[in-house]
């Protein structure tokens, strides 16, 4: 973890047709946001979900990477034809899309030369100059290009990798939270909550989250 900074923010970009179609339910947004906040003092200020379409990926990469200190992407870095995140980021930043020597060796050792096919080799290709995010689960690394952290879409693999992002991040101020369980009707306390929020707006963020018993 790098030197602490007062306010550090991030965006999350979820890439995948399967999320937009409803076939797959995203589990990465909540995990990444919670991990960044509790471990790094980094606030997630925006989340977008987009399809596997090069032009849309490029547009969002450029927009969000300029807007926030960090951008975390998930999905699209696997071995199949529709995994186009790495080449899209290369085009966004106008750098070569090429084999990363260390990533190539990691994957070749993991699969063995006889089973290291073109699809698996593809997972070693990324934007030139990228730093690796090591993968203790299935070998294929994620990568960091400028301030963009690219991780896989499979939640269990992403979870196993995310600690390896920490040393590349500048830590922000830690946010502390407290939960009060009030067994009352929300509308009866809305005025008081609004008054407290207005009075302490610079240091406190109050939310009301109803539940049914």
Q: Where in the sequence are the language-model features?
A:
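Glycine-rich phosphate/diphosphate-binding loop of Rossmann-like nucleotide-binding domains
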Residues: 2-52
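Short coil/turn connectors at secondary-structure junctions
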Residues: 7-10, 40, 67-68, 127-129, ...
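Secondary-structure boundary/capping motif
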Residues: 21-24, 56, 81, 158, ...
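N-terminal small/polar loop signature for handling phosphorylated ligands or for N-terminal nucleophile
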Residues: 30-91
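Generic secondary-structure signature for well-ordered alpha-helical cores
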Residues: 37-43, 49, 66, 70, ...
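Proline/glycine-rich low-complexity loops and linkers
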Residues: 56, 84-172
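An accessory alpha-helical subdomain
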Residues: 147-213
């Amino acid at each position: 973890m790098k030197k602490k900074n007062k306010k550090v923010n991030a965006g999350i970009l979820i890439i995948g047709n399967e999320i937009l179609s409803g076939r797959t339910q995203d589990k990465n947004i909540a995990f990444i946001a919670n991990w960044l906040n509790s471990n790094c003092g980094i606030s997630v200020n925006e989340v977008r979900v987009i399809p596997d379409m090069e032009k849309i990926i490029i547009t969002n990469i450029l927009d969000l990477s300029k807007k926030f200190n960090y951008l975390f992407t998930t999905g699209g870095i696997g071995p199949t034809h529709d995994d186009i995140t790495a080449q899209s980021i290369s085009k966004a930043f106008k750098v070569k899309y090429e084999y990363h020597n260390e990533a190539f060796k990691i994957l070749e050792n993991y699969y063995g030369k006889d089973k290291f096919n073109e699809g698996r080799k593809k997972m070693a290709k990324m934007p030139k100059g990228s730093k690796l995010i090591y993968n203790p689960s299935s070998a294929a690394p994620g990568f960091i290009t400028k301030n963009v952290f690219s991780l896989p879409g499979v939640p269990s693999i992403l979870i196993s990798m995310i600690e390896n992002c920490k040393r590349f991040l500048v830590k922000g101020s830690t946010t502390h939270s407290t939960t009060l369980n009030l067994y009352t009707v929300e509308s009866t306390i809305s005025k008081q909550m609004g008054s407290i929020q207005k009075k302490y707006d610079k240091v406190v963020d109050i939310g009301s989250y109803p539940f049914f018993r």
